[in-house]
Every structure is written in structure tokens, then in C-alpha cells.
Amino acid sequence: DLKPEDVIESNHYWETANASALEQYCNTFYPKLIIGQGNPNTDGAMEFISIDCQSDNIYSTGANNIAWGQNLVTTSDSQWSWSIIRGCNEFLNNYQRSPAGESAKNQYAGEIYFFKALDYFNKVVRFGDVPWYTKPLTTNSPELYQGRNSRYEVMDSILMCLDRAVELMAKKTNVARVSKDAALALKARVCLFEGTWRLYRNLEGSEKFLREAYNAAGELMKPEYGYSLYNTGNKPYYNLFIQDNYTGNSEIILSKEYDASINMGHDISRTLPLSNYGMSRDCFEEYLCAKTGLPISQCSCHKNKSSSIEMRLRDPRLLQTICNPADGEDCYYLWKTVNGKRVGGAPNIFSYMEGTDDRPYYGTSTTGYCIAKYYNPAEYVDLRFKGSVDSPIFRYAEILLIRAEAGAELGEDPELDKTINLLRKRAGLTFMLSPTPPAEGEDPDMIEKYPDIKGPNAYLIREIRRERRVELFAEGLRYMDILRWHCGHLLNRPRRGAKSNMYTAKELAYLTDKVPIKDGFIMPYDLRIDYQPNFTEKNYLFNIPLNEISLNPNLLPQNPGWE
């Protein structure tokens, strides 16, 4: 019988595995779980942006099968794979036999606990209840046929793994390596997810996980960890995401490294101009007015203004996240050239090549709001895999947002001047968030989006959610936010792009021929006959793969709605 490739065969391996061998063992998990923008030399990899396309933040020209209710019952699923867990259990059951020193064994065991927690968390988000395994299994192990453990059991076990990781590892010394700091950051993220998942479904245990999130974030905010928001240059938010090395950066807790000079580059600055992604109008509208601090629904500054003018009136992070079509050729990829000739009609909209078949030329954006975040002009080259900009995995800004949200949900002090308002100051805003609404009252659009928030902190929680969406745009977290808040209805809202009045008459004449316009907004999906928003309750989880149930009927019952 063939043995699994990721299981150490020799009974003597662990007795001779020194610190270097333990490190090499841990290294195999980084490309599997620390994804960043994708693994080096992967064509078209932009993982954070692709994940945000599952949400209401970013639209692409492809189908969103989850939001459209088109994902079918699957027979197999690559995420129902247990090789990572098997590898983690192999290490945890044997590493104490290593002759390495205690500090090395503790560090690498902590890394493995981190990876086990992360892989299991990804499985819980996708499937809910899953089997919990504590030892490496063989083809004859009876545990292969056990049923699924409850979400409650699995999440408690994940929390145990994270606590062990925090206990065993030292503080960060290498920004590209898992540390105590990274384990605290993952703990804060995981516990915020689970606490709010339970809270907005009236399930027991929500306060426990929210408290863990609040405390983990608070620990990282202590001065001895040395974190602060990056605030260099006149566009610090934009500049944060185009750096080749995060060593010494006060905001980055963990990053994924790339280096084109050693054939470990990525393609994001080359691919982004060709990707046809675009920020949604719904996301655009959550950026507050820079002059008044008011939302678009309450501010007269923006009435009858084109999108390009609106951009300059908003929270400065907007124009550090997307680019303005009014900037013309100074905006990095509004115009594309084929055979020495500009093609397409209006800039900033996915357009059509002149020719015999009218095929779409995907050179710009679905919505008119081209994404500038992560784009480094110095890396915009025709050659592939020449990008060396590193990818933040955890950053201090998220920790501040977790502290504020968990605190507000618990009724604790969200420490606004140490959390949300630090983010606003870094952005260059002069208006700060307070616990009570302004004289103009609450934003009716936010109340409509989040009607389930109740209690004295309802306004504050809604505004923290706004801040989270703005600050963490295109970082792969919005879809999980929608899941945990039980807000799948947001994916059923109309999918609008930019205002059509930001185009000239000539451009608009071209656009109306190719891109639907409704109530003054570009509607990028209205030409798709398969576009029917239909996110329902079953879509909060995926089905258990049918092939797995055939092999192990104890995995039943199937997830709700997938029977």
C-alpha cells in the first residue's frame, strides 16, 4: 500500500530532526496557508481582490455563483482535504522526540498550532461542522469514518490551538514568519468572526468569543509590541501596499514575501490593468464627505456632481484605493493601445475592440472605478512575474477595527480615539467618530443595510462596519464579514457602477450602445441573462461533498438547504 506523501515514513526521523529540520517541516505549510496575493509565478493571481469579488465590494465580468445562487451541489471540494491537518498532527505527536533545543521546539510547535487553527477555521467558515482529528491517520484508522464534530466543539479546539501558539512562540522578529504576534492577530480575527456569527443567529457562546477577540486585540495594542499605523509620505494608505519589504514597518504583523530577482515574483501590477475588476458604487458610497464628515445620503456637496468630481470630495482613502478617470493618461491604465491605436470608447469601463466580432476587450474596469490599491507603477511591465511588492497578511489597522467592533458589541469602551479615529487621522480626515450620531441623525442607508443591529450601540456598530469596509477594501475580508453578520441580503442589492455623467457626450453615446445605464448609473450586469441575485440562507455554508458522504455516511446530515 502507498503511504501518504506528507507523512514521515522513518520511525527514526524525529530522533534526528534538529532545529533546521523542524523549520523546514514548518516551511511546507507557508505556501499552502499564507496565501497573500497568491503563490509566486502564478498567472493572474490576485487572491485578495478575487475573494472580495464574492462580496459587494468588487465586481468582475465573471459570474458570482454564490451571490447569484448558482453554486450547485458538488461531488468533490478541494477544501475538503485533510493533508494539512494530517501533517500538523504528525508534527504535534512527535516533535518532542527531536534533539533540538526547547526554544526551537516551542517556536515550531507554535507555528504548527497556528497552521492547524487556520486550516480548521477555513473549514468551519466553509462547511460548519467538520471532523476534529488529533492524530495522524492511516488508511486503517477507524477515525476516518467518524462523524462531524459540532461547530461548538471545533471552535473551542481552534481556540485551544491558538492559545497554545501564543504561549509557545516568541514575539515577532521576522515579519514573514509566524510569531506570537501573528497568533494573537489570527485569534482576534477568528474570535470576532465566531462571536458575531453566533450573536446574529442567537446562538450561545457569542460573548465568550467576542471577549477573546477584544482581549487579543488589546494585547497587541500594548506598547511593548511596538505597533503603530504606517504614516509616511503624502499618501500613506496607498504607499503601505506597494512596498517591497515590510521589515521594520510598524503596521505589518505578518507578510508574504515576493522577490522577482530570485524567480519568486508575482504579476499583480501587470494583471490588475487587464483584470476588468471594479469597485462597486455601493462601496463607493460608504466613503464619507471629507469636508463635512457626512455620508452621501445626508450631504449636499455631491448632488449633481460627476463621479470624478465626487472622488475628490470624499475620504482621501478613496483616491488611494481607486483612480480617477479625470486624471486622464496620468491614471495608470485608463487607456489601452492595440497596434498603435487606442481602442474602446470611454476610459475606465470594460470596452469593446473595434473589429468584426465585437468581442469585449478587458483592459479597464467593469464599473468605472479602477482599483489602484496594490498597483506599483514601477512594476507595470510587459514581462510576467516581475512583481516584488510584498503582501500584508495581518496588519495593525485590522487589530484596531477588531478592538472597536468587539468592544461595541460587548458594551465595552471601543476606545475610539485609540482605534477608529487613529485610522481617520492617518487618512487625513478632520472629523472623528463619536458614540452618538451627528445632529443630522443616522445614515438611513446604513440602517437599511444593517437592520438587525439593536441596542444603545447600534449607531456606533454600523459606523465601525463602514470604517472596516473602507479601510480593509480588497483585503479578502468583506465576504466573511457578510457571512458573520448574517447579511447575505447585501449580495442581492442592485449592482451599480459609476455615474454615467462622468463621461463626455461622445463617450456616453458609445457606452449606451454597449453598457446598460439605469437611473444615471452604469449597470455592468444587466446584459447578463444569467444575473439574478439569489443569495439564500443555505448559501452561508457549502455542501459536504457527495463523494465524501458516499465514503463515510457518518458525515450526514447534509448542511441545511443542500439535502
Regions found by a protein language model. Give the residues of each.
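C-terminal substrate/ligand-recognition segments
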Residues: 316-425
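Extended ligand-binding clefts on enzyme/binding-domain cores
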Residues: 228-359
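Short coil/turn linking the two alpha-helices of tandem helical-hairpin repeats
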Residues: 124-126, 131, 173, 193-202, ...
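Conserved, well-structured interaction surfaces
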Residues: 14, 18-27, 31-35, 59-127, ...
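Membrane-proximal, proline-rich intrinsically disordered regions
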Residues: 1-42, 549-563
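Long, intrinsically disordered, low-complexity segments
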Residues: 1, 81-82, 157, 237-293, ...
